[in-house]
């Protein structure tokens, strides 16, 4: 085997080992990102919602910093309601389509439909309100008490 081929094979193996250490997003959260993209017509990168205000991202506490953050709080509460119904919202995959007016749910089971409705309402809410860069990556221990 040629040395160049060995180097290429080594590079592929090393990159695969590195990638295996990155935890995957729960399936539904990856799907939620696509629903958001449908609702806002791709205006904002999905990562903008992963660390915004007091509620957009993992956890959440305090008073939402603005209407966009309130969308995330409402979404968290909707997921909590889904869990009370026995659903697993961060793992539940559902069926939806992206129409000219935004995303629409067409799931059959109760859990799929409930989780899809949570995501579509949040995505539509995100699309309605402005994004304030000052509320990205804030100090939550100070601003979200």
UniProtKB/Swiss-Prot annotation:
Task: List the signal peptide residues.
Answer: 1-21
Source organism superkingdom: Eukaryota
Q: Which annotated residues bind Ca(2+)?
A: 55, 57, 59, 76
Q: Which GO terms describe its biological process?
A: arachidonate secretion; lipid catabolic process; phospholipid metabolic process
Q: Keyword Metal-binding, does the record have it?
A: yes
Record's cofactor remark = Binds 1 Ca(2+) ion.
Keywords, comma-separated and alphabetical: Calcium, Disulfide bond, Hydrolase, Lipid degradation, Lipid metabolism, Metal-binding, Secreted, Signal
Q: What is this protein called?
A: Basic phospholipase A2 PC10
Q: Which organism is it from?
A: Laticauda laticaudata
| Top-level taxonomy | Eukaryota, Metazoa, Chordata, Craniata, Vertebrata
